[in-house]
């Protein structure tokens, strides 16, 4: 037996030796290959451990996942082991990584700003700024602006192999510093000082290729998936130095006879080779960032459902982690992420920085203590100065030396951000025998320079970096990461993929074009079309013109699609992903098939059905012409989009381009009627070439060869061309096609240049008061000043603001409690979940929730994502728009009634939605005016508003513009406080707050929570949802409602001193881990109640709570609170709203007036556009009104009216859509708060347009009427003004109406576009009413533009009895007779026309108001 066992063992050993020998032979064979081949092959083991030789580029997705699982199996816990293996491999052959040391010396960044009301974007300020900017550019004036110092001569060193944390309160200069170091500062800032990488100036290297700046803004293409986004970024950036490093590593390992780890070898080769469709590095980065679960999900936007905001933030980081940059500047990358995810990402950055000797600076808002401990160095900034730069573990010693100590239970990062703040500093003063005096940032910076760490830093900066130690691969001197031909291929594949993803848009455009073609076919039906007279020819000419306008207009969709993508393109450009032409060339080439399909469809549907010349060659020629026109159109509107760069501006530019091209195209106004000073415009109009080419192609054909008669030998076609001043040579067809193709090339070149050299429009600056600017300068310079006693009292005590304790306010309120029992909430199961096998019809989101909120008690509502925190708050506040609610809610013992509850409660939404063009004080006055009782006079309202501003610390910002979130105006933290203030001025008894500290830095969160505590101390009832709060924030609450995933309650009760009650409760449960000393109770609570812990312990925390004494006590409390006291009275109000409908309307109109006045991108651009159009059309149509000798001259006058109405109207409608969309979104919050009814808001939006449209129509009518020399009588001018006014008005109301009936302005613009085409077709200009087929005449009367043209022409010419020569050149009739016989216009119908244009205004405005009232596109 022993012998057999011995034999078995020897066989086993021999088998093992054979395997090892086989592996050695396999590696030996691999090592014998040439280096080029060797680094492209590796040994891969499958799931059972069977080795095989593979091509690195041929790894399948399943093999990649298996490899990653083996390499980084425990990435969630600690990636250190993986990086240690990487480092060990390089150390084994003594191969060093390229290191980069970044230095900045005396870095000064300054800007020039306007102060106070001069900074508000009003129309006068907008005009003055434009004029000043123009004069400044030509060095005529400097302009009166105030200097604002952003970075104040700072110096420092960022060393490789050390992870650096950048901290500082808002507006301290963190982002500016990171942008400056990355070489990405805007040209509008004045910069001085020196920045070097390894001793080399930024001008000597390509900084964006050497370093990478991760922006706060998450700009991505919505239609791409997460994986596609990362793959594209990785392929564009290339592999950098990694390929050369791999070659050297392979060479040294071969010489040393080292056999590398198989899996690591494949991974590193994949990393260095790049160019693969799905590279391992992308899979690895997705795994590290937690994006592997949504890898194939679209990024999405407001139109496309996609990944969450936190996932987008991680994707922004991942885009640059897949690249080869050795220096990373990461700006607030944790926004929207929970602390565990942030900790995981920072841990990865720490180990990669240490192992690969990278240079990394990361700016974070609220790093948890665990995350803070991962950093090696800290840079602390305040007011543009560096307060401290050095090792993390020495920073507290520095502040201790100045008399400021961090409390034991305080997060160090929070302490650092607060200790430099004037309002927070006092609480950290720790020298009892010395009175506290405020130490401004300037003094801290001065003290640091005298501190040993500061002296050491200064000494290092004195010695220049020795360039001999610069690794040859460290700094990038090439513009792009891969060859330009490869970048072109990458872009081609990317845009081809985007076209597939956007297939719906292209199909929708095609269907839209097909429908319009079918309508056109039935309007210009060959059975009603003849070839007998010049008037017949005019109808054919009109059909050709309409076809070309439709094809031209079809390219307009490029404007919104391009403008939406521009931020991403600018980001790619600035990061040197690819040259601009590598994007524009594929976009041009890929548009060719769509042009072919759409042009072919139009020609195929309309050519023979309309009755054009039957010769097939002419059919093909029309197709070629329309294809060339479509290509030119796409190029033209890409130019307009890249030049406009903002949706409203680009749309206006696009409309203007259409106007110029169409007006000077030779159809609206004939060539011989265009004044000599505008004839150059005719020759450069692309539509002119298309018009002439299409005309000769048709009218020199067989159908038009009969003699025109009237003493001429010319054919009918030739006579028509001469009559309309069109060219008559056959060669003009080829001139037209060549010109259109030439314009296509020109426009695409201009598009490329604009994309390469233009930058996004600058943001509106926040409003800075003179006092604020002066105080900022004092702090910066370190001037000493003592905090006044009142201010000290107000802000001392950090979060627990003592000043407002038991303090009364101007307006009294009634303290109320809110109790609720057995709250259940159900929603219908989505179809997607049903398809996954869920059988129930309803999904329960809240399960028997019972609790109470009391006056003077601050309650926290806490739970993991998906626990139902916001859902519970929405249910209690009555904000849910769908689902089924069960349970009882009582207000101080009385059943809750939503009509009255909205009057005594406030709801602070997480989104911070406000009207962007109001100032802070105006927003508060508006809320107070509509929500306070009607018997409170305006003086008391103002006093109360100012009291609330003081309470929430907004007094210094009272004149600041609110702006749009993430775009301009107030910072995130300031917007949070404004949201709270807007609800507080309603004098509510109960306030709900949804995530009031999300997205804020520690200091800002402390300010907000201090605000909340101040409000509670006035005796109000407040409940806040909160997500993983810091110790300070968590322990500022009095009570806690803690929910677990699934909508069940697991704790409801007091927190206690230092959370002792909470800790006592959970530690009493058997098996729950005890809290560690100094640990955050909120984080501990979430950890020990996680679903994994429930599974480990085999318990249900919800069941434990339901059986606890605490739950029983809560039920008893709710039993008491659910019954009114003897003296209590139920709250009742005589009306639903505090103000009458008229008062609501006046208040809404007041707000809209301010909003319009301060929105120059909407209002001023409209006026500017109107002035330009009136001057342009006035000079083109010079004295047209007095020329009435021929039918063509009358047609020219009609053309000028048609062009103005259509283009000013469509521009107004398009521009109004985004404005109304934003205001409607704000109104959802305001109406839910019971501020006003839908109708006063809607009619205020309607009425505010009256003066602006009146100004527009007066500007246009006065200028154009005078220049065109229409009959100068008061009656005729007033009729002209009347029709222009109401025509522009109904277009504007139509744009507003389409927005009101659709979810957003993008959908509205899609819905509106076909109607513009139909209004154009049936306006009576291209085909007179009498020539419209009988089956379509009803639509002529339903067309507002037709009534406008009717009214304008009849009011000017309907009573004119002078003779006019007809198009045959012989016969004459009176002007009014011509209008009646040819156009079908009668002077008797002038009054009807006037009534109809007014009726359309009324109709569109009423539909708008009804839609605002009836439709709610906000889903809660």
UniProtKB/Swiss-Prot annotation:
Binding-site list for ATP 1: 168-175
Positions of the ABC transporter domain: 135-408, 818-1070
GO biological process: cutin transport
UniProt-annotated location(s): Cell membrane
Superkingdom of this protein's organism: Eukaryota
Record keyword Nucleotide-binding present: yes
Membrane topology, as annotated: Multi-pass membrane protein
GO cellular component, one term: peroxisome
Expressed in which tissues: Ubiquitous in aerial organs. Higher expression levels in young, expanding tissues than in older tissues. Detected in the epidermal layer.
Molecular-function GO terms, alphabetical: ABC-type transporter activity; ATP binding; ATP hydrolysis activity
Transmembrane regions: 504-524, 544-564, 585-605, 623-643, 648-668, 674-694, 735-755, 1162-1182, 1202-1222, 1235-1255, 1277-1297, 1307-1327, 1334-1354, 1392-1412
Keyword Methyltransferase: no
Main location per the UniProt record: membrane
Induction: Repressed by cycloheximide (CHX) and abscisic acid (ABA).
Disruption phenotype: Chemical composition modifications and structural alterations of the cuticular layer of the cell wall leading to increased permeability of the cuticle, increased sensitivity to herbicide (glufosidate), increased cuticular transpiration and increased resistance to Botrytis cinerea.
Keywords tagged on the record: ATP-binding, Cell membrane, Membrane, Nucleotide-binding, Repeat, Transmembrane, Transmembrane helix, Transport
Binding of ATP 2, residues: 863-870
Domain ABC transmembrane type-2: 486-699, 1143-1357
Job of this protein: May be a general defense protein. Required for the formation of the cuticle layer of the cell wall.
Family assignment from sequence similarity: Belongs to the ABC transporter superfamily. ABCG family. PDR (TC 3.A.1.205) subfamily.
UniProt name for this protein: ABC transporter G family member 32
Species for this entry: Arabidopsis thaliana
């Amino acid at each position: 037996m022993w012998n057999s066992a011995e034999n078995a063992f020897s066989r086993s050993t021999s088998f093992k030796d054979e395997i090892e020998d086989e592996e050695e032979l396999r590696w030996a064979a691999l090592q014998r290959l040439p280096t080029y081949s060797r680094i492209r092959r590796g040994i891969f083991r499958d799931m059972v451990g069977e080795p095989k030789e593979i091509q690195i580029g041929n790894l399948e997705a399943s093999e990649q996942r298996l490899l990653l699982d083996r390499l980084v199996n425990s990435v969630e816990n600690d990636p250190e082991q993986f990086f240690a293996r990487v480092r060990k491999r390089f150390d084994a052959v003594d191969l060093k990584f390229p290191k980069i040391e970044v230095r900045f010396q005396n870095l000064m960044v300054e800007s020039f700003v306007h102060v106070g009301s001069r900074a508000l974007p009003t129309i006068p300020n907008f005009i003055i700024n434009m004029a000043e900017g123009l004069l400044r550019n030509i060095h005529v004036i400097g302009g009166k602006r105030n200097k604002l110092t952003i970075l104040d001569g700072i110096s420092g060193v960022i060393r490789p192999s050390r992870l650096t944390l950048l901290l500082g309160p808002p507006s301290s200069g963190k982002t500016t510093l990171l942008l400056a170091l990355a070489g990405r500062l805007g040209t509008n800032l004045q910069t001085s000082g020196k920045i070097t990488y390894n001793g080399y100036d930024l001008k000597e290297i390509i900084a964006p290729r050497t370093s990478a700046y991760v922006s706060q803004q998450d700009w991505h293409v919505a239609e791409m998936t997460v994986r596609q986004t990362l793959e594209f970024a990785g392929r564009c950036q290339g592999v950098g130095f990694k390929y050369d490093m791999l070659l050297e590593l392979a060479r040294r390992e071969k010489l040393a006879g080292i056999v590398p780890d198989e899996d690591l070898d494949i991974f590193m080769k994949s990393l260095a080779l790049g160019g693969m469709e799905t590279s391992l590095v992308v899979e690895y980065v997705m795994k590290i960032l937690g994006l592997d679960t949504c890898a194939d999900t679209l990024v999405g936007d407001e139109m496309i459902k996609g990944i969450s905001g936190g996932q987008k933030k991680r994707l922004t980081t991942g885009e640059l982690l897949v690249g080869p940059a050795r220096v990373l500047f990461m700006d607030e990358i944790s926004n929207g992420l929970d602390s565990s995810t942030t900790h995981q990402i920072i841990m990865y950055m720490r180990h990669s920085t240490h192992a690969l000797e990278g240079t990394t600076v990361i700016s974070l808002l609220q790093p948890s203590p665990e995350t803070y401990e991962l950093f090696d160095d800290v840079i602390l900034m305040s007011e543009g100065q560096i307060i401290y730069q050095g090792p993390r573990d020495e920073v507290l010693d520095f502040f201790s030396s100045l008399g400021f100590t961090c409390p034991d239970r305080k997060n160090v990062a929070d302490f650092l951000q607060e200790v430099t703040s004037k309002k927070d500093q006092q609480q950290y003063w720790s020298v009892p025998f010395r009175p506290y005096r405020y130490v401004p940032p300037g003094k801290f910076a001065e003290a640091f320079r005298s501190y040993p760490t500061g002296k050491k830093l200064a000494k290092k900066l004195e010695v220049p970096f020795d360039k001999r130690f610069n690794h040859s691969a460290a700094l990038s001197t090439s513009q792009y990461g891969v060859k330009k031909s490869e970048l072109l291929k990458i872009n081609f594949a990317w845009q081809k993929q985007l076209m597939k993803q956007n297939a719906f848009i292209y199909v929708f455009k095609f269907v839209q074009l097909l429908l319009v073609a079918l309508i056109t076919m039935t309007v210009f039906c060959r059975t009603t079309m003849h070839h007998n007279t010049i008037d017949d020819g005019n109808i054919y000419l009109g059909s050709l013109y309409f076809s070309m306008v439709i094809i031209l207009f079809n390219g307009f969709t490029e404007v919104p699609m391009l403008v939406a993508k521009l931020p991403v393109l600018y980001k790619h450009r600035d990061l040197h992903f690819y040259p601009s032409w590598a994007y524009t060339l594929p976009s041009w080439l890929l548009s060719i098939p769509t042009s072919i399909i759409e042009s072919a469809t139009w020609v195929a549907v309309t050519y023979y059905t309309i009755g054009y010349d039957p010769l097939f060659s002419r059919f093909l020629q029309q197709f070629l012409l329309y294809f060339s026109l479509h290509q030119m159109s796409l190029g033209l509107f890409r130019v307009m989009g890249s030049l406009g760069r903002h949706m409203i501006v680009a749309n206006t530019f696009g409309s203007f381009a259409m106007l110029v091209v169409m007006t000077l195209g030779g159809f609206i106004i004939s060539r011989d009627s265009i004044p000599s000073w505008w004839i150059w415009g005719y020759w450069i109009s692309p539509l002119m070439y298309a018009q002439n080419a299409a005309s000769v192609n048709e009218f020199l054909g067989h159908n038009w060869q009969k003699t025109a008669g009237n003493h001429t030998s010319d054919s009918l076609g030739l006579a028509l061309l001469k009559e309309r001043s069109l060219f008559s040579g056959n060669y003009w067809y080829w001139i037209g096609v060549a010109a259109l193709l030439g314009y296509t090339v020109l426009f695409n070149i201009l598009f490329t240049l604009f994309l390469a050299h233009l930058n996004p429009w600058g943001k509106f600056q926040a409003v800075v008061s003179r006092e604020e600017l002066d105080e900022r300068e004092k702090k910066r310079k370190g001037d000493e000043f003592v905090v006044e006693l009142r201010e000290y009292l107000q802000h001392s005590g950090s979060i627990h603001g003592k000043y407002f304790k038991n303090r009364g306010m101007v307006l009294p309120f009634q303290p109320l409690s809110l109790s609720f029992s057995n709250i259940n909430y159900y929603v219908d199961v989505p179809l997607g979940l049903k398809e996954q096998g869920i059988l129930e019809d309803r999904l329960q989101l809240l399960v028997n929730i019972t609790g109470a909120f009391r006056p003077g008690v601050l309650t926290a509502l806490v739970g993991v994502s998906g626990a139902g925190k916001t859902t519970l708050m929405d249910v209690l506040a009555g904000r849910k728009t769908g689902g089924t609610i069960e349970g009882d809610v009582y207000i101080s013992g009385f059943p809750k009634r939503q009509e009255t509850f909205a009057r005594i409660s406030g709801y602070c939404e997480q989104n911070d939605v406000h009207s962007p063009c109001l100032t802070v004080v105006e927003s508060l006055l508006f809320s107070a005016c509509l929500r306070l009782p009607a018997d409170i006079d305006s003086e008391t309202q103002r006093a109360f508003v100012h009291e609330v501003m003081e309470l929430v610390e907004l007094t210094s910002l009272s004149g600041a513009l609110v702006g749009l979130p993430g775009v301009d105006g107030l910072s995130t933290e300031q917007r949070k406080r404004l949201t709270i203030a807007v609800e507080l001025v309603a004098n509510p008894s109960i306030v709900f707050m949804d995530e009031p500290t999300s997205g804020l830095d520690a200091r800002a969160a402390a300010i907000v929570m201090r605000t909340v505590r101040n409000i509670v101390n006035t005796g109000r009832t407040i409940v806040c949802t909160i997500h993983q709060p810091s110790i300070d924030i968590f322990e500022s609450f009095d009570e806690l409602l803690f929910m677990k995933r699934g909508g069940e309650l697991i704790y409801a009760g007091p927190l206690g001193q230092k959370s002792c009650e909470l800790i006592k409760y959970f530690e009493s449960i058997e098996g729950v881990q005890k809290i560690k000393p100094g640990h955050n109770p909120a984080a501990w609570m979430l950890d020990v109640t996680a679903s994994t812990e429930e599974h480990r312990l085999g318990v249900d925390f919800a069941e434990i709570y339901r059986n606890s004494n605490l739950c029983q006590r809560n039920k008893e409390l709710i039993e008491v609170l659910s019954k009114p006291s003897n003296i209590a009275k139920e709250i009742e109000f005589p009306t639903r709203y505090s103000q009458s409908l008229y008062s609501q309307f006046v208040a809404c109109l007041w707000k809209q007036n301010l909003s319009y006045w301060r929105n120059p991108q909407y209002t001023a651009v409209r006026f500017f556009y109107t002035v330009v159009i009136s001057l342009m059309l006035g000079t083109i149509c010079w004295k047209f009104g007095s020329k009435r000798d021929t039918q063509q001259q009358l047609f020219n006058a009609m053309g000028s009216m048609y062009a103005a109405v259509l283009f000013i109207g469509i521009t107004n409608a398009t521009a109004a859509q985004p404005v109304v969309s934003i205001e409607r979104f704000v109104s959802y919050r305001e109406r839910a708060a019971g501020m006003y009814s839908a109708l006063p808001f809607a009619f205020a939006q309607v009425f505010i347009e009256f003066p602006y449209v009146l100004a527009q129509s007066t500007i246009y009518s006065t200028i154009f009427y005078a220049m065109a020399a229409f009959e100068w009588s008061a009656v005729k001018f007033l009729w002209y003004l009347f029709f222009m006014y109401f025509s522009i008005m109904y277009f504007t109301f139509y744009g507003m109406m389409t927005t009101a009936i659709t979810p957003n302005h993008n959908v509205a613009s899609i819905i509106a576009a076909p109607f513009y085409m139909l209004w154009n077709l049936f306006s009576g200009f291209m085909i007179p009413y009498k020539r419209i087929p009988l089956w379509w005449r009803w639509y002529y009367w339903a067309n507002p533009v037709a009534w406008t043209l009717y009214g304008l022409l009849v009011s000017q010419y309907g009573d004119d009895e002078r003779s006019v020569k007809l198009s045959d050149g012989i016969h004459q009739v009176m002007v009014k007779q011509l209008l009646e016989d040819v156009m079908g216009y009668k002077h008797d119908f002038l009054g009807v026309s006037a009534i109809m244009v007014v009726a359309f205004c009324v109709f569109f405005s009423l539909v708008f108001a009804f839609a605002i009232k009836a439709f709610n596109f906000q889903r809660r």
